[in-house]
């Protein structure tokens, strides 16, 4: 089974994670907002409250060496950039880091 991480559970990230879970994809969902993580946990098993800018935190929840990671942090461009940088440092084998921000 393919595993995809979704970082950021705003409108876009929430629906991407939910849709992927319906396609028999293992989803690891991450956000720093407890309410958003609780909402998505109704649809997927691996949902975590995490500071996505922390390499150590991402590694602890299993976000390393994945083929695809989707970053959907929204309007906080700094957090989005720092998250992508942490992923690049952490995931030497990651083939796709998809980023969706609103600027």
Enumerate the predicted regions with their spans.
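Cytosolic regulatory regions of ion transport systems
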Residues: 1-103
């Amino acid at each position: 089974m393919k595993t995809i991480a979704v970082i950021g559970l705003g409108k876009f990230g929430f629906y991407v994670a939910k849709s992927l879970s319906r396609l028999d994809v293992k989803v690891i969902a991450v956000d720093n907002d407890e309410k958003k993580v609780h909402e998505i946990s109704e649809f997927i098993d691996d949902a975590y409250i995490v500071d996505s800018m922390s390499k150590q935190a991402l590694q602890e929840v299993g976000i390393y060496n994945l083929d695809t990671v989707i970053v959907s942090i929204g309007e906080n461009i700094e957090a989005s950039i720092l998250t992508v940088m942490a992923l690049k440092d952490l995931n030497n084998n990651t083939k796709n880091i998809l980023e969706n921000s609103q600027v």
